[in-house]
């Protein structure tokens, strides 16, 4: 990760970057900056209504976005359980979270991601990252830094590191019902 410090600086400056997740590269930015989120949505041509996933290596970095009052110990155990398949959980959203993150929903999508690159980024920054697959509409998600450069251009900031080598994107589940919205 020879460009880790440069990518961290860009994220501090509210820029959009690409970074490796469990299976593909994601596009991410500071979830606390609406202008950065708008840039990400525009770059990807993603409708605001869809919302975004937040990833972090620890629950503590995701707590500012979650309405904890609706969750029991059972829900937190479910959330904390490490499985072979990466799981994005649909959870109750804290009232102060921007609609740029939630889209048309009154929930927030969050995932514990322990890929080394995500751990290093989030620990250095002190916040979670937005995550949506690094690809343009109609093209497959990028699985390598080279593929990101091919789709987004040589000058697009990408953290040159390995994904978690999972084949499928994360499964998306409801924390209360465990209903699967997207199979992983």
UniProtKB/Swiss-Prot annotation:
Compartmental location: Cytoplasm
Principal localisation: cytoplasm
A single MF term (Gene Ontology): ATP binding
YrdC-like domain ranges (all copies): 1-184
Catalytic activity: L-threonine + hydrogencarbonate + ATP = L-threonylcarbamoyladenylate + diphosphate + H2O
tRNA processing recorded as keyword: yes
Entries under InterPro entries matching the protein: DHBP_synth_RibB-like_a/b_dom, Sua5-like_dom, TC-AMP_synthase, TC-AMP_synthase_SUA5
GO biological process, one term: regulation of translational fidelity
Entry keyword annotation includes tRNA processing: yes
Top-level taxon: Bacteria
Key words, A-Z: ATP-binding, Cytoplasm, Nucleotide-binding, Nucleotidyltransferase, Transferase, tRNA processing
Record EC number: 2.7.7.87
Gene Ontology cellular component list: cytoplasm
Annotated Gene3D superfamilies: DHBP synthase
Pfam families: Sua5_yciO_yrdC
Classification via HAMAP family: TsaC
Described function: Required for the formation of a threonylcarbamoyl group on adenosine at position 37 (t(6)A37) in tRNAs that read codons beginning with adenine. Catalyzes the conversion of L-threonine, HCO(3)(-)/CO(2) and ATP to give threonylcarbamoyl-AMP (TC-AMP) as the acyladenylate intermediate, with the release of diphosphate.
Protein family (similarity comment): Belongs to the SUA5 family. TsaC subfamily.
Protein name: Threonylcarbamoyl-AMP synthase
């Amino acid at each position: 990760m020879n460009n880790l410090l440069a990518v961290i600086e860009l994220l501090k400056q509210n820029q959009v970057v690409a970074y490796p997740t469990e299976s593909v590269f994601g596009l991410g930015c500071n979830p606390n900056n609406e202008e950065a989120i708008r840039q990400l949505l525009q770059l990807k041509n993603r409708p605001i209504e869809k919302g975004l996933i937040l990833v972090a290596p620890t629950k503590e970095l995701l707590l500012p976005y979650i309405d904890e009052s609706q969750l029991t110990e059972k829900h937190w155990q479910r959330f904390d359980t490490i499985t072979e398949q990466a799981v994005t959980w649909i959870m109750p959203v804290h009232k102060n979270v921007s609609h740029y993150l939630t889209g048309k929903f009154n929930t927030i999508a969050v995932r514990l991601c322990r890929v080394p690159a995500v751990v290093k980024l989030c620990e250095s920054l002190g916040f979670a990252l937005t995550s949506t697959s690094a690809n343009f509409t109609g093209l497959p998600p990028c699985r390598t830094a080279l593929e990101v450069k091919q789709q987004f251009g040589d000058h697009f900031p990408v953290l040159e590191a390995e994904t978690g080598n999972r084949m499928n994107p994360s499964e998306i589940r409801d924390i209360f019902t465990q209903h699967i919205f997207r199979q992983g």
